[in-house]
């Protein structure tokens, strides 16, 4: 009898301790978002619709030694796709594309170019959702000793350079870049930026490498993120509006704390 009572009591205590643990929501929701597959369909892609981003295009800027008289730099979309992505392409009727860039410089040295998103004729920074842990993309290397970096802007407004490796290989390669934990991705201030943003790609030449004929192609830029990292109980109240206090105070002829700048 006593053993039965002890057993029932133990089960009751176990249930009491486990119930709150089971009921607590997870603080992690790891997802992967494809930012751009460079298929250039002329309409908003899935990420632009999901994140509320603008329908950006891509542009390029270069260092001063670029061969402008030769019409460089050149950028366009081309039919193509890495073999590893072809198996994942469920729409067999589609025509996957990649973004290509061709450069030629007048002399060796510390030459560079940047491929960046653009909207309405101005540079546009793509917002990340959640807290990104890694960014990866496919790049076609021409076996030149060039170096490629990712540029991101943190929630404090500082631009960080994330090295992705060199381009001394032939064909397609998937490059994966870990986002350092010290980069602030969310501002603690209500008036501060709510997310980290993607600024663009930067490619740098080795000072001793040939620079007269270089091609590079990009495909499927994506990132892995914890979408719940900045979500907390009462999150919906963070950006609530209290109304236009300044207009109310001016109409009544009295001042208030809401007028303080």
Residue ranges and their predicted role:
Residues 17-23:
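Sec/Tat signal peptide C-region and signal peptidase I cleavage site
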Residues 23-261:
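Beta-rich carbohydrate-recognition modules and glycan-binding surfaces
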């Amino acid at each position: 009898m006593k053993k039965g009572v002890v057993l029932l009591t133990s089960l009751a205590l176990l249930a009491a301790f486990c119930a709150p643990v089971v009921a607590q929501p997870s603080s992690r929701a790891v997802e992967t978002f494809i930012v751009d597959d460079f298929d250039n369909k002329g309409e908003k892609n899935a990420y632009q619709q999901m994140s509320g981003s603008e329908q950006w295009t891509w542009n390029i800027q270069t260092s001063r030694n670029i061969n402008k008289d030769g019409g460089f730099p050149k950028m366009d979309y081309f039919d193509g796709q890495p073999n590893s992505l072809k198996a994942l392409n469920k729409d067999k009727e589609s025509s996957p594309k990649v973004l290509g860039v061709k450069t030629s410089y007048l002399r060796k040295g510390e030459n560079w170019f940047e491929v960046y998103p653009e909207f309405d004729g101005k540079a546009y920074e793509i917002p990340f959702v959640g807290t990104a842990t890694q960014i990866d993309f496919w790049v076609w290397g021409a076996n030149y000793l060039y170096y490629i970096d990712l540029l991101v802007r943190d929630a404090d407004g500082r631009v960080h350079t994330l090295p992705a490796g060199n381009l001394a290989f032939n064909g397609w390669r998937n490059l994966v870049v870990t986002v350092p934990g010290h980069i602030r991705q969310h501002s603690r201030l209500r008036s501060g930026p709510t997310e980290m943003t993607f600024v663009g790609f930067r490619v740098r030449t080795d000072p001793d490498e040939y620079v007269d004929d270089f091609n590079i192609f990009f495909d499927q830029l994506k990132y892995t993120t914890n979408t719940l990292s900045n979500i907390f109980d009462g999150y919906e109240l963070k950006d609530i509006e209290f109304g236009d206090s300044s207009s109310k105070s001016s109409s009544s002829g009295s001042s208030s704390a809401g007028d303080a700048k």
